[in-house]
Amino acid sequence: ALERLQWPVYNPEDGTGAIRYLVVRTGFYSKQSLLVIVSTQPRLPQVREFVDLVRKRVPSLCGVVLNLNPHQTNVILGARNSVLWGNDHIIEEVAGLKFNISANSFFQVNIEGLESIYECLDQFLNPQARDIVLDAYCGVGSLALYMARKVKRVIGIDECQAAIEDAVVNSDLNNLVNTTFMDGTVEKVLPT
């Protein structure tokens, strides 16, 4: 589709071109896919045609997002997203928990590894109903929400605002009322 539409690919040497990356997030169990077009430009020509071409080839596609990253940097994603079609996230379900995962949020890519981490949490921490858990750098809440089903309260902290927003949504998706999520660095959020 890129060749067909002749979208100029980004050249990091001189900063020319529009398309920096194409990022695909796919749910391991849900099989939903989100395509993120990382561009140096806020608008792309023939974007509807591009979306239609991709949708025909990827039936599991649930959304296409344009991410703006105009800076000459090795950071992949910029801060600003706009939905070109569909959803701005995928939904994944792991260990009976539903997770809303957006373009800029961190989520464990190795789901079987995440399930093993859950087993280790149970084995080594032996969470109890009276416990209060702090999840520093919680991302979308994958560990925090797992623990929230077992303990009195969970507090999650992350400096990525998109991840915190997803964590709050995920807590609601799973009907968990014993969670608090805070945006900021751990060093600034926690009292010394």
Name what the model sees in each region.
Residues 28-31, 60:
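Short flexible coil/turn linkers enriched for glycine and charged/polar residues
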